[in-house]
Amino acid sequence: MSSYFVNSLFSKYKSGDSLRPNYYECGFAQDLASSRPTVVYGPGSGATFQHAPQIQDFYHHSASTLPSNPYQQSPCAVTCHGEPGNFYGYDALQRQTLFGAQDADLVQYSDCKLGGAQGLGGEDAEGTEQSPSPTQLFPWMRPQAAGRRRGRQTYSRYQTLELEKEFLFNPYLTRKRRIEVSHALALTERQVKIWFQNRRMKWKKENNKDKFPSSKSEQEAVERERRERELRESSGSGGAAGGGGGGGGGEGGSGGGSVAATTAGSQPPVNVDCCEKTHKQM
């Protein structure tokens, strides 16, 4: 399809001079075009430059080294004589100055790049020189001293009260409930966990148990036994005090009997004949 359009253009425009506008046909432009290399465009190939005869004589050795392009003899090739910028309506001098400015900028940028590369190289060298130095140690990275101990956590009255109520309800907390309690009391999960562990140990010491009850019913049974034991101990101490009081009362009774015996022994004996005489007279 591309060959069709190229052939149609080739048949309509026989030479490249007809494609150039008339206002470019001046002596200066012709001289410039004659001094400039000729550019040949072909399908599937890049731009091929054909230099002027004086330039070819000056660079005679380059003509022998450049291979000939087989696409130049193709009938589909479009040959444009002169500067390719003239074909598109651009001035060759402006393009030349533009390229010159770009070359100067590139030279300046290359110096900057070289300086930047040297600076980077210097920084890399400094980094390699500083790398053998020991890394910075933060306080949390250093091991704790032997004489130092972690501070004891203090709980407020409100926190202690809430933790005690939670312990009475359930001595063992699940992970979800522990998170809820820690958020409610402004504590960490670790602090709540440690508090419950210490509270269970305290309960075992108070109840003389080697193992904390796993269920609430077992805990209630243990509490009941403890209360009964306390009641027995209190009743035993009260009975011993009452027995001592009863013993004192017995001593008092025996003392009273001896007093009565002594009083009875001190009175004279009663005469039976006198009693009978008085009864007959009545």
From Swiss-Prot:
Motif window: Antp-type hexapeptide: 137-142
InterPro entries referenced in this protein's UniProt entry, alphabetically: Antp_homeobox_TF, HD, HD_metazoa, Homeobox_Antennapedia_CS, Homeobox_CS, Homeodomain-like_sf
Keyword set, alphabetical order: Developmental protein, DNA-binding, Homeobox, Nucleus, Transcription, Transcription regulation
Compartments reported by the entry: Nucleus
Basic and acidic residues biased stretches: 206-233
Positions of the UniProt region annotated as Disordered: 118-138, 206-282
Pfam families, A to Z: Homeodomain
One term of GO molecular function: RNA polymerase II transcription regulatory region sequence-specific DNA binding
Stretches with biased composition (Gly residues): 236-258
Lineage: superkingdom: Eukaryota
Any one GO cellular component localisation term in the record: nucleus
Family per similarity comment: Belongs to the Antp homeobox family.
Function noted in UniProt: Sequence-specific transcription factor which is part of a developmental regulatory system that provides cells with specific positional identities on the anterior-posterior axis.
Name this protein carries in UniProt: Homeobox protein Hox-B8a
Organism: Takifugu rubripes
Gene: hoxb8a
